[in-house]
C-alpha cells in the first residue's frame, strides 16, 4: 500500500524534524524508521525524496525567506522546532515546486494541527501566506 500525499508530507516532516535534532543522523536510516511507522515496505515515493532533499539542499535560502517574515529580533532558530520544520517545508513547496500555494499552505496547516497549537497554526498561516504573495 503506498502512502497518500498527506502521509508523505507527514513522513517528510518527521524525517526533517529528526535530522534537525540530530544533524549527524543518516537520512536513509531516518527515512526507513519513519516509513516503518506506516508499515510501508515499498521503496520511498519520489515525492518524499524530493521534499526531504529539497528542504535540505535549499535550507539556507528557505530560512532567509522565512526570516524576512519574522518580527525584528526574531530568527528562524528561535522558533519552536515543529513550527520551524513546517515553515521550511511549506516555504520549499511554495518557492521551489509546482504545488499550488493554497495546497502547500493547507498541507502545512494540517501538519500544524497535529504537531503545534492554535497560536502556532495562525503564525504559520500568516508567514506562509506572506511568502506566497
Curated annotation (Swiss-Prot):
Disulfide bonds: none
UniProt keywords, alphabetically: RNA-binding, Transcription, Transcription antitermination, Transcription regulation
An annotated GO cellular component: cytosol
GO MF term list: RNA binding
Biological-process GO terms, alphabetical: DNA-templated transcription termination; transcription antitermination
SUPFAM superfamilies: NusB-like (SSF48013)
Pfam families: NusB
Database matches in InterPro entries: NusB-like_sf, NusB_fam, NusB_RsmB_TIM44
Family named by the database record: Belongs to the NusB family.
NCBIfam families referenced in this protein's UniProt entry, alphabetically: nusB (TIGR01951), PRK00202.1-1 (NF001223)
UniProt function note: Involved in transcription antitermination. Required for transcription of ribosomal RNA (rRNA) genes. Binds specifically to the boxA antiterminator sequence of the ribosomal RNA (rrn) operons.
Name this polypeptide is given: Transcription antitermination protein NusB
Amino acid at each position: 500500500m503506498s502512502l497518500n500525499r498527506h502521509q508523505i508530507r507527514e513522513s517528510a516532516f518527521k524525517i526533517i524534524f529528526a535530522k534537525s535534532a540530530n544533524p549527524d543522523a543518516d537520512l536513509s536510516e531516518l527515512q526507513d524508521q519513519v516509513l516503518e511507522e506506516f508499515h510501508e515496505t515499498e521503496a520511498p515515493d519520489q515525492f518524499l525524496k524530493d521534499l526531504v532533499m529539497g528542504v535540505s539542499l535549499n535550507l539556507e535560502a528557505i530560512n532567509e525567506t522565512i526570516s524576512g517574515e519574522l518580527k525584528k529580533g526574531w530568527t528562524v532558530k528561535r522558533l519552536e522546532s515543529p513550527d520551524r520544520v513546517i515553515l521550511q517545508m511549506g516555504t520549499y513547496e511554495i518557492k521551489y515546486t509546482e504545488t499550488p500555494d493554497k495546497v502547500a499552505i493547507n498541507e502545512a496547516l494540517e501538519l500544524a494541527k497535529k504537531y503545534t497549537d492554535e497560536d502556532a497554526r495562525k503564525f504559520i498561516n500568516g508567514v506562509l501566506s506572506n511568502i506566497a504573495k
